[in-house]
Regions:
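N-terminal basic/disordered segments at the start of proteins
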Residues: 1-12
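Generic N-terminal amphipathic, Lys/Arg-enriched alpha-helix
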Residues: 11-29
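N-terminal glycine-rich anion-binding loops that anchor highly charged ligand groups
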Residues: 12-16, 35-64
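Aromatic/hydrophobic pocket-lining residues that form the small-molecule binding cavity
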Residues: 36, 40, 109, 133, ...
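Active-site-proximal beta-alpha core segment in soluble small-molecule metabolic enzymes
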Residues: 53-199
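Active-site loop/helix belt of alpha/beta enzymes
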Residues: 152, 158-277
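Short coil-to-beta-strand transition motifs
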Residues: 249, 279-286
Length: 290
């Protein structure tokens, strides 16, 4: 099936025929591989030069699907969201780099570590744990000392969404100081989650001001991190910001050098927005008519 084909009656008739040939007679989620590939290629073409792509694993929750997207997009970066997901990906895709999209409580991390095989513990070097407070950084440091391992930490910067994370200032400084004095902790990057930029009402310049404020906050966080950790450390670290709804707002890698997306590759109706117009729907729910 052509990825550029319109969603016509003929298209859905072809899907129906394919499902019947496959012997699928119960409700299923169907991915049009041709359309998926078209979206992957579109994403890569739209990324600024030097912008790395990280696959959001929860949006494409299938090992085969993740591997396919990773190969076609030429990336080994995944975003996971809880300890159970980390464990599954460590077991099945141990060579992929994982970045947590949400902080994991230290108790959950301890439970995860207790259940890992020795080979999987080695793969922990591929995981970046999201840290949102100085207290969590301290807890991770204590656990790392007790377990005699090194944990990579990516710091969540509150750029205006106010879901958590640290603003530039005392909290961020305390976290950076904790990492600096703890050999078992390593700074791997900064994350600035900003999906609110495309959801604000277009009144009185709100989107423009929010975008400007986001850039100012994140720039200040990078500057503070550079002052504490050194320019070399910051140059090589992950600066993750954009997601499916917002990555087209970035024209270069001056601020962010990595974006994370998953849903835009299959484009459910929630992602039918102007910035994602170049992408086509690639996921469909099929159910027999009784």
């Amino acid at each position: 099936m052509s990825g550029k084909a319109a969603l016509s009656n003929a298209y859905f008739a072809d899907l129906q025929t394919a499902l019947a040939k496959a012997g699928l007679c119960e409700p299923v989620l169907l991915i049009d591989k041709t359309r998926l590939n078209q979206n992957i290629d579109t994403l890569k073409k739209l990324l600024p030069r030097g912008m790395a792509y990280r696959i959001v694993a929860k949006s494409l929750p299938s090992e085969k699907l993740l591997i396919h997207v990773a190969k076609r997009a030429r990336t080994d970066r995944l975003m996971s969201f809880n300890a159970a997901m980390v464990a599954q990906l460590l077991a099945r895709l141990p060579h992929y780099d994982q970045l947590l999209g949400k902080p994991v409580p230290v108790a959950a991390l301890a439970t995860l570590l207790a259940g890992l095989k020795p080979s999987q513990k080695k793969a922990l070097a591929q995981v970046q744990w999201l840290i949102d407070t100085p207290q969590r950084a301290q807890q991770y440091g204590e656990l790392a000392k007790a377990q005699k391992l090194t944990l990579r930490l990516n710091l969540e910067i509150d750029v205006g969404l106010h879901r958590g994370g640290m603003a530039p200032g005392e909290g961020l400084q305390a976290t950076l100081d904790e990492i600096s004095k703890t050999p078992q902790l390593a700074l791997s990057g900064l994350m600035g989650y900003e999906p609110h930029l495309t959801k604000l009402p277009k009144l009185a310049g709100w989107p423009r001001r929010a975008k400007s404020a986001t850039r100012e906050i994140y720039t200040a966080a990078v500057a503070q991190t550079t002052q504490t950790m050194g320019a070399r450390a910051v140059k090589n670290m992950v600066r993750n910001m954009a997601g499916s709804p917002t990555f087209r707002l970035y024209q270069d890698t001056q601020l962010a050098n990595e974006m994370a997306a998953g849903s835009t590759l299959v484009k459910p109706s929630d992602f039918d927005m102007p910035l994602l117009k170049p992408f086509v729907p690639a996921a469909f729910i099929a159910t027999p008519a009784l």
